[in-house]
C-alpha cells in the first residue's frame, strides 16, 4: 500500500541522517536533533518560546512516519460517510494545504479494500512548501507512476 511504502522511505531517510540530521534546521538555539520536539513546537506554539513552522525536510519525514496512519484513518472514517464517492468514473480530490498528500494514502487503502472504485483519479494538492514536502511528493509519484488510473497530479504551488 502507498502509506506503507512512503512511511518506509521517510523512515529510511530520517534514520540515515544520524549526526547531520539538523543540517538545514533553522533553529535559533542549539538543536536537540529530535524532529519530534520541533513538531511539538509547530503544533503547540504556546508551549514554547521557539517559533517553528514546517520548514525542514527532516521534519517532514518525521511527520509522515509519526502522523500519517492516524490522519489517513481519520480521512477513511470521513470518506466512508459519503456514499456518492464509492463508485465514480472520475474521482476528483482537491486538498488545500496538502502537505504530504495523506488523502492519497486514504484513497489507496479504500481502493485496495474494495470500499471505493474509480476509473480515474484527479488529485490536486495545493501547498506552497515544495521545498519541505518535495521528497514525499516524489515518492508518491514514483509509487503511482504505473497506475494508469491516476491523472492530473499536482502537488505544489498556487493554482
Give names to the regions the model predicted:
Residues 1-45:
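N-terminal auxiliary segments of SAM/dcSAM-dependent transferases
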Residues 48-85:
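Class I SAM-dependent methyltransferase Rossmann-like catalytic core
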Residues 82-83, 111-115, 140, 144:
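Active-site catalytic pocket residues across diverse enzymes, especially alpha/beta-hydrolases
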Residues 89-99:
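Conserved class I S-adenosyl-L-methionine
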Residues 100-117:
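Conserved SAM-binding loop of SAM-dependent methyltransferases across substrates and taxa
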Residues 122-127:
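Conserved SAM-binding motif I beta-strand of class I
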Residues 133-159:
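S-adenosyl-L-methionine
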